[in-house]
């Protein structure tokens, strides 16, 4: 009898629609691999739903709070349902950008300088010397990210408005010029490195990530061999330092601009990367010789408790 997999998707975070895309793509691929699949749009009754379903494993395709911060992982541990991706601690740690940076820095991974500030204070005066980036402490998909370019710019006033829905504290970081890189990690190996070139603008914002034609993916990234290998080393070290399991994706910046610093820094580790067939991790896996079906099969067969 084929293994029964519950694909968890949707939820109630700001990344709901992205999660539905990931979940439906994974579900279709698993069906193609011969699994019995139940698509679960996660709501407040998720404990009851899973108790009644009793799947053999859960593929976690949720994004954002509750889905990648240790919450759903803790529930799955309580219900004794093996699951994919990282466990409770690694998920919670990676989701909190500042605490994740502290752990990565201790492991020798270069990260941008920065500090946590109250959003109202950041709206009154520059928390760092521009250029700098302000971002929510615990959001994905570049939600709420603001770049302040020079001293003449006013501090971002949206931080003090009712439109800001990403928490009272924000992370201000030194802006690192240069190239946007990402590296997929699968288990104990780094699969490959992609350079992301936004079609409009100079950084990989929400529209560049999810709008059709919003970015160009250069795979493998056109880097000197030593830099390419260093990106992979940093991604794998960050994955291991945070205690990640299964699939993760590290996002980095590399300043190779004329007269630049040459800095290569890890911005964050995403424990629940996008999982449509055209998402970054499946693209990198395909380039490494692993089809989308093979990738999701590996993820389900890797599922366990106590992650």
UniProtKB/Swiss-Prot annotation:
It is found in: Cytoplasm. Mg(2+) 2 binds at residues 268, 270. Its cofactor is Mg(2+); Mn(2+). One of its GO terms (molecular function) is metal ion binding. Pathway: Cell wall biogenesis; peptidoglycan biosynthesis. Mg(2+) 1 binds at residues 251, 268. HAMAP family: Dala_Dala_lig. This is D-alanine--D-alanine ligase. It comes from Methylorubrum extorquens (strain CM4 / NCIMB 13688).
């Amino acid at each position: 009898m084929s293994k029964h997999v519950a694909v968890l998707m949707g939820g109630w975070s700001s990344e709901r629609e992205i999660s539905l895309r990931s979940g439906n793509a994974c579900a279709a691929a698993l069906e193609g691999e011969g699994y019995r699949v139940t698509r679960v749009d996660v709501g407040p009754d998720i404990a009851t739903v899973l108790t009644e379903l009793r799947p053999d494993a859960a593929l976690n395709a949720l994004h954002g709070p509750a889905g990648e911060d240790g919450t759903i992982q803790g529930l799955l541990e309580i219900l004794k349902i093996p699951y994919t991706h990282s466990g409770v601690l690694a998920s919670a740690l990676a989701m909190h950008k500042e605490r994740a940076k502290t752990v990565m820095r201790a492991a020798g991974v270069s990260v941008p300088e920065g500090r946590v500030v109250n959003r109202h204070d950041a709206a009154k005066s520059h928390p760092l010397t521009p250029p700098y980036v302000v971002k929510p402490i615990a959001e994905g998909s570049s939600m709420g990210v603001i770049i302040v370019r020079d001293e003449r710019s006013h501090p971002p006033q949206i931080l003090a408005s009712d439109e800001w829905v990403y928490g009272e504290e924000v992370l201000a970081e030194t802006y690192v010029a240069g190239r946007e890189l990402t590296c997929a990690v699968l288990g104990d190996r780094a699969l490959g490195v992609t350079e992301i070139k936004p079609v409009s603008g100079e950084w990989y914002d929400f529209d560049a990530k999810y709008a059709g034609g919003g970015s160009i993916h250069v795979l493998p990234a056109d880097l000197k061999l030593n830099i390419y290998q260093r990106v992979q080393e940093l991604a794998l070290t960050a994955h291991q330092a945070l205690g990640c399991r299964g699939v993760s994706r590290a996002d980095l910046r590399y300043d190779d601009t004329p007269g630049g610093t040459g800095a290569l820094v890890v911005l964050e580790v995403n424990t629940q990367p996008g999982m449509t067939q055209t998402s970054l991790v499946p693209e990198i896996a395909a380039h490494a010789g692993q089809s989308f079906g093979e990738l999701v099969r590996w993820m389900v067969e890797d599922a366990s408790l106590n992650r």
